Amino acid sequence: NSVHPCCDPVICEPREGEHCISGPCCENCYFLNSGTICKRARGDGNQDYCTGITPDCPRNRYNV
């Protein structure tokens, strides 16, 4: 059973000083910069971008 390198094995949360364990906006235990494309446009012309404060990829608010 291997432990994720970003995960504190005792509490299974990001290690001290690190931001995240996984997610489309998490790389090497840190949030990707705000404005990094996390989901390319698929026909609607709108891409989704990382916020720089969460490992999730929020839906572009202009997508309807």
Curated annotation (Swiss-Prot):
SMART domains named among the record's database cross-references: DISIN (SM00050)
Disintegrin domain sequence ranges: 1-64
Compartmental location: Secreted
GO molecular function: toxin activity
Disulphide-bonded residues: C6-C29, C20-C26, C25-C50, C38-C57
Domain of life: Eukaryota
UniProt keyword Manganese present: no
Tissue specificity annotation: Expressed by the venom gland.
GO CC terms of this entry: extracellular region
Keywords of this entry: Cell adhesion impairing toxin, Disulfide bond, Hemostasis impairing toxin, Platelet aggregation inhibiting toxin, Secreted, Toxin
Record Pfam families: Disintegrin (PF00200)
Motif annotated as Cell attachment site, chain positions: 42-44
InterPro entries to which the protein is assigned, alphabetical: Disintegrin_CS, Disintegrin_dom, Disintegrin_dom_sf
Function, in words: May bind to both alpha-IIb/beta-3 (ITGA2B/ITGB3) and alpha-V/beta-3 (ITGAV/ITGB3) integrins, and may inhibit platelet aggregation.
Family to which the UniProt record says this protein belongs: Belongs to the disintegrin family. Dimeric disintegrin subfamily.
Subunit structure and binding partners: Homodimer; disulfide-linked.
The protein's name: Disintegrin schistatin
